[in-house]
């Protein structure tokens, strides 16, 4: 451990470290209004301020003359204001045109809906503008670039940070405040052990913070970002692992043994496990049979890759060991499907099981409770209902959670608490890039199944515009003529629902506050139900959405499974778990509203039987600007059926939290890590976190306490679960 952690000796540097926790109100230049503005940005402490890094830089070391600035490229140009003209080409459209000149030419700059700029600038002002250079009407032009008035005598070879600011704090004042904060903090003790900094070739924390805000070169900025990204990843890995292990310090892991139930279950399966499935199961079996540690494993698999069969094998191992297992799913639909598909296999293997949901009748619920407490039941399938205080197991040794990201951490821990020392297996059919899995599931060992054990008929995907709607209706009619069924997916439930309740997806223009700024017709299930009943007479069409009572949802899904409904108009409630092999067509309205991973999950509902499926993604994109980008993104669905490839594309375009649904259920937002480019760095942080905790399981020693404190400060919301806060 001595190689990893050096004991701090300089008390002054600890005092400077504590300065990071000081309230921003104590900083120089932070007045009442500026304090309010900073707090609106989520900045409450000096540490928050220093982690509020620039989102771009004005690089005067690489500025261009107007003549040499390349067209189609984002450039920084330093020039002088020659003329300012305000125009109003149409109602509510104000344009401020600024002509900039240097010794080589003229640059026409247009600012839209920013009339105050005319009051901020005057002829003769020296500006630095950064934006994309275009050419039209004989002049080079920029549209709404970022600009900075240069102070008299400013050196041309500097780099200016550009922060996100709020009313009450200008860019200039933000720089002054950040500079003052860096002075207050000085050169604090670095929580990351010196051994790791040398091993990973990282600059110190203090230097990284200075360099990320005020770099002398963009290369220095990149080195600083690398240090802060590693720090972010390491802290997150440690926080997640400490949280996961915090309640397990005094428990004794259970050493399972495989036996007759497992052998019988494998015989009952309609197919042999594929090589990938077998590797994943052996990972799980090794963990379950290890009496020295509790299993914490993520089983990650694309749609139809057979995760359920692997999980069933784990359930059999628990039964072979004379203990119980619980499978928790996010919806009653999915829990019932697990019971319907897996239950008969368990019965053939000599295991007893039951299903418990919110809709379970009281008498049945009492019977299940009694069988659990007596040990008569081997496996319980259920929803959040299994978390009820009156659900008690005789000996719960395995917890399986499906679609982990749809549950809060507290729910996961509550179920696990019903069996101290229970192994944990979480599963998801949402393809997640490896870097993202290592980051946000850093507390879990990962097994991946990429390919289907039994190749299905497949799905053909086409992206259609509104003008091709007849093709979509024709596909539904053709499927119906063959005795097959269809889904129509809408982003909204009712016409009154707000567009701004939806996730922010590339391709839709929004203003700075996230509001939709272009008129995009949004489809809702209520209106679509009426429209389809008119367009497709003679077909039985019903709708399904998450606001329906559980019993009503079950009724509709059962009717669809029995073939009594021809077309199901639904929200994304069918994204996970609805398995109707006779459904062969899916039409997704407003495809630009969904991420690639979600679209891939949705299309996985068709083509599940012996007949190939058709997925038609409707878009209102017109082929220009952001709409063109949205259409390009959607067309990648036509080119690949690999969910992991699509997830990697999604990661480049969207926030990691949007892929996993973390806006409601998650722990983290990664501000420094580039999940697409930092794979090696993320791997380092993962390995280093494991090594640190191997030698100091709680980071509570004198040598590691500063690191633990830094982790607790950065990820308070995660770490408080370790201390019981």
Label each region the model flagged.
Residues 80, 132-133, 239, 591, ...:
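Short, surface-exposed secondary-structure boundary micro-motifs
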Residues 290-635, 698:
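Inter-lobe coupling/hinge segments of SF2-like helicase ATPases
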Residues 34, 71, 87-268, 662:
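Upstream accessory/linker segments immediately N-terminal to the RecA-like ATPase cores of bacterial MutS
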Residues 558-581, 586-589, 604, 608, ...:
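Accessory helical-bundle/CTD segments and flexible terminal tails appended to RecA-like ATPase motors
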Residues 1-28, 36, 236, 246:
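Long, highly charged, low-complexity intrinsically disordered interaction regions
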Residues 52-82:
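OB-fold nucleic-acid-binding modules
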Residues 271-295, 309:
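N-terminal pre-P-loop "Q-motif" helix
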